[in-house]
C-alpha cells in the first residue's frame, strides 16, 4: 500500500518511497520528504553528472560531490549545472 507525503521538492502531495534509498540522516530525510517522482528526477540528474564529469563511485571525493549536489537539488532548490548541456526546450 502506498503512502502519500508532502514532497518538499515538488511542493505537493505525492507517493512516498517504498523504503529508505540512501543511508544515514540524509537518507531518513529523503525517505520522509522526497517522493518517488522527485527521486526519479534526481536519478536522471545524477546519471548526467556521473557521465559528464566522469565521476567514480569508488572515489570518496566524487561521492561527496554527488551527495552535495543531491542535497542542493532536492532540498535547496538548486538545479544541477553541467558545462555544455542545454536542456531541451518545451
From Swiss-Prot:
Gene3D superfamilies: Fe(II) trafficking protein YggX. GO terms for cellular component: cytosol. GO terms for biological process: cellular response to oxidative stress. Signal peptide: none annotated. GO terms for molecular function: iron ion binding. The keyword Disulfide bond does not apply. Keywords: Iron. Monomer. HAMAP family: Fe_traffic_YggX. Belongs to the Fe(2+)-trafficking protein family. This is Probable Fe(2+)-trafficking protein.
Amino acid at each position: 500500500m502506498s503512502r502519500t507525503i508532502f514532497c518538499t521538492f515538488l511542493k505537493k502531495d505525492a507517493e512516498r518511497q517504498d523504503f529508505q534509498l540512501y543511508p544515514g540522516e540524509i537518507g531518513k530525510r529523503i525517505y520522509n520528504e522526497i517522493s518517488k517522482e522527485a527521486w526519479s528526477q534526481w536519478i536522471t540528474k545524477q546519471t548526467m553528472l556521473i557521465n559528464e564529469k566522469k565521476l567514480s563511485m569508488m572515489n570518496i571525493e566524487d561521492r561527496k560531490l554527488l551527495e552535495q549536489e543531491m542535497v542542493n537539488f532536492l532540498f535547496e532548490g538548486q538545479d544541477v549545472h553541467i558545462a555544455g548541456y542545454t536542456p531541451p526546450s518545451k
